[in-house]
Amino acid sequence: MGKLQDWSITTCLFLFFLHASQTHCTSQSHVRNRLYRSKRGIGSSIDTSHLNAIRRLSVSLSLQNISGVNQQEQKERDLIENLPGQPSVNFKQYGGYVTVNESAGRSLYYYFVEATNTKNSSPLVLWLNGGPGCSSLYGAFQELGPFRVHSDNKTLYTNPYSWNNVANMLFLESPAGTGFSYTNTTTDMENPGDMKTAADNYVFLVKWLERFPEYKGRDFYIAGESYAGHYVQWRHGCGDFGDSYNVRTEDDESNGCYGMASVV
């Protein structure tokens, strides 16, 4: 009885959060348009400092305290056997946290679904929704993920057009404060910015690949929509990331990010 009650609570929280995410996302295009108008103003210039920050990030920062974590055990804990009301599928899915800043207590939540049938050869795609602050779970369950929500708001059905038909999909809740991602430091919420978001995304990827090392060496793409068009540009700082993790690129086919895309 207690387990059934826990699932009921989980289902309610999931559906409430999905509805809240959808409501929030309806305004992201307005935020994006205001930003573009301000950038086109007289004397204005686009801030690219976050790209330089990514280049300065070291792997030693990315791997802080990672040696004390058994990544294989953490991966097993992240395994999602079944979502509430989901149909039977032939791929695995995972959800969990990756700490990107130990001292601040800042952790990002991810939802990962393997490619159907071809997980061992398909590329890895990182998906980011816009906002800023729009949950990538909205993208996962309303746009390009493997499931959609039935009209009864209680069960799921498979999405025949899911991107995981051709790729391993990694949905990231970023920046901290978005969706299930959180921080224990108040100033993180008071002083957000693209530079901090890009740096956290970089650290997340380095640590995530320690948890899922089988995806090192894969073709790697970054994709997103709306304001995420600003985030995906941190691919220019992925050279150091690729050097350490042998992720294929479009530049030299051995390091960094293989491609990027932004959907308006």
Curated annotation (Swiss-Prot):
A Gene Ontology BP annotation from the UniProt entry: proteolysis
Keywords, sorted A to Z: Glycoprotein, Secreted, Signal
Record-level Gene Ontology MF annotations: serine-type carboxypeptidase activity
UniProt entry tagged with the keyword Glycoprotein: yes
Glycosylated sites: N65, N101, N153, N184
UniProt family annotation: Belongs to the peptidase S10 family.
Signal peptide span: 1-23
Protein name in UniProt: Putative serine carboxypeptidase-like 53
Gene from which this protein is expressed: SCPL53
Native source species: Arabidopsis thaliana (Mouse-ear cress)
PANTHER family listed in its UniProt record: SERINE CARBOXYPEPTIDASE-LIKE 36-RELATED, SERINE PROTEASE FAMILY S10 SERINE CARBOXYPEPTIDASE
Keyword Signal in record: yes
InterPro entries per UniProt: AB_hydrolase_fold, Peptidase_S10, Ser_caboxypep_ser_AS
Localization: Secreted
GO (cellular component) term, any one: extracellular region
Any Pfam family matching the protein: Peptidase_S10
